[in-house]
Amino acid sequence: RERMVVPEGERFVCVAGTQPMDAAVPEARRKAEPGTIIETCPGAAATVYEVAGRLNEQGGAALFIDYGHDTVRDGSTLQAVRDHLKVDPFVNPGEADLTAHVDFATLATIAQSRGCKWLGTVPQGRWLRNLGIDARAQTLAQAAPQHAQAIEAAKERLVGEGQMGLLFKVMGLACPGWPGGAGF
């Protein structure tokens, strides 16, 4: 069943919907125990399906970068962020950004079902390091020593395990016959 958000008194709460959502659940997850929360994003699935088809027809490669997981997981990742802090998504609606983690494993399966080459899904920090972010940051810092601390801080935000380096993932797709992607 779909989870719905409904008003309850002065706040909002999640409740089970009345309509089955079997068509939206990825095939690999249809045998989950009743009551298991399985997040799906039909919009992301449709986008990857379309991009994979275009890559096969027109050639090329695509990168998808966002926070999420590269293995199938159950449970809710819904969160609200206001002023860089996590807040209750059901309090003061409209005053926070709502978000959920990307299910890269399902998106990779969709792309491969269209004949697309999956280059991999790796943590952003590893991908950037494989592409040479450390050397680039060092070169920038040497060229502008007055900005060396800011450059190092910006690099650490992108690659640090406690920052964006592990939470954010990079998924690469390419047309068949395309060489392996750099960074993967």
Regions found by a protein language model. Name each.
Residues 1-37:
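Intrinsically disordered, low-complexity linker/terminal regions across diverse proteins
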